[in-house]
Amino acid sequence: MKILVSNDDGVNAQGLHCLSEALCSLGEVIVVAPDRNRSGASNSLTLENPIRVETLETGKRYSVKGTPTDCVHFAVNKLLDPWPDIVVSGINHGANLGDDVIYSGTVAAATEGRHMGLPAVAVSLVGETHFASAAHYACLLVSRLRTHPLPSDQILNVNVPDLPLEQIKGIKVTRLGNRHRGEKMIVMQDPRGKPVYWIGPPGEKQDAGEGTDFHAIEQGYVSITPLQVDMTAYGSVSELTTWVGEFK
């Protein structure tokens, strides 16, 4: 089994190292990850600049001057022949819950893998301590996917509580919750007195009741949310057809 591993925290991130080491027990692991932290890159591609790749360990580990999506795109389309059997993204240093998935480079790397037709999993630790717990569940899921593949348009978004493995209560299949919108912008001055702006923290959780990814994490469970690459709102097609018909 050939496993492509990427992330958005960068090629030297602890979570990436822990994940790739754990997955070695399941097959051949190739790491292709950004050269630096690219959190919040979402599904962006580098189009106006060349993508430079540094080989850190031939056949095993590559550093890419680009986004998480660039990494998977390059690995599948150029680097790896034959293609990998699965894409695993993570372990992210922090949660990807609710609306976070819109911005997440971790989820984006998995999405690009699925867009290429490969099974894909995004794994995040809700904290920065117990990476071994997240790696354990990543291995369980990859093993399961090998024998029981998902539908062709789905990826798994996995969030793991920052707890020792023995304290995690189990797994819950969840839906995405959501947050209040984040409105805070942090204003500072550069050394020349000109204003600079930082995007502030995300909004507080809003829809976080039972059945959501937020709720599962709060209760000490691993949250697994199926996401789909096809973003069509099928439930609205009929209503929108009627709405558009009123223009005639």
Curated annotation (Swiss-Prot):
Q: Which GO terms describe its molecular function?
A: 3'-nucleotidase activity; 5'-nucleotidase activity; exopolyphosphatase activity; metal ion binding; nucleotide binding
GO CC aspect terms? cytoplasm
Cofactor needs: a divalent metal cation
User: What Pfam family is a match, any one?
Assistant: SurE
Assigned EC number: 3.1.3.5
SS bond list: none
Tell me where the transmembrane regions lie.
Answer: none
Q: How is the cofactor bound?
A: Binds 1 divalent metal cation per subunit.
Q: What reaction does this enzyme carry out catalytically?
A: a ribonucleoside 5'-phosphate + H2O = a ribonucleoside + phosphate
Q: Which keywords appear in this protein's UniProt record, sorted alphabetically? A: Cytoplasm, Hydrolase, Metal-binding, Nucleotide-binding
User: What does the UniProt function comment say about this protein?
Assistant: Nucleotidase that shows phosphatase activity on nucleoside 5'-monophosphates.
Note the NCBIfam families from the entry. PRK00346.1-3, PRK00346.1-4, surE
HAMAP family noted in UniProt: SurE
Name-wise, this protein is: 5'-nucleotidase SurE
Which organism does this record belong to? Answer: Tolumonas auensis (strain DSM 9187 / NBRC 110442 / TA 4)
- This protein's gene is called surE
